């Protein structure tokens, strides 16, 4: 288990940089509506959904009901269901740790688990577990720092939630550069663009994910040859 820590930490450095900043932004926004570091800690520990927590700040500010918060968070993060489908067998082999892996499967962690290569002599399950735990700890740390520093120094939070979009863009570019097969990426861009144009920004995510899954299944034979 300990041997896998160093390569896992190295692999998660980009997420460390992004999560500290994005988590910090979340913490500042949470402090801005009157919640302190304890709230940030337990929110990031138990919810752990970047976009969902950003939405949570808006809903808390509007004094939305718990039912509204739960439904909106589910709709916003239901894309994670599709992530989990590709790791059913992998997580099952990890024993009791699979429950934490399911919980901690964020966009960035999923991206790393799909692309990272386990060094020789390192257990792949241990490395995946460390990646998930490290990413989670970065997010918690960023949020707590945001609420603490946000309470000391004044911040203008206008546009600060764009940090999440920035991180997604960086991860997409890194994955594009690390592989020769760009068909899945082009599928994703096309499906998202068409869905956005037809359904608008409030309703495009789930249909786009469904379209991407259908296209990937339909072209799995060709994609397997391209990757090989």
Spans of features found by a protein language model:
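Short, Lys/Arg-rich, polar N-terminal cytosolic tail immediately upstream
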Residues: 1-7
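Pore-lining transmembrane helices
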Residues: 7-102, 116, 138
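Alpha-helical transmembrane segments of multipass membrane proteins
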Residues: 24-28, 45, 55, 112, ...
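Membrane-water interface at transmembrane helix exits
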Residues: 27-31, 88, 118, 146-150, ...
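Alpha-helical transmembrane segments and their membrane-interface exit regions
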Residues: 48-51, 75-82, 167-173, 192-194, ...
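Juxtamembrane membrane-interface segments at transmembrane alpha-helix termini
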Residues: 53-58, 82-87, 173-178, 196-205, ...
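Helix-loop-helix junctions within the multi-pass membrane cores of secondary transporters/permeases
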Residues: 70-161
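Membrane-embedded alpha-helical modules
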Residues: 125-207
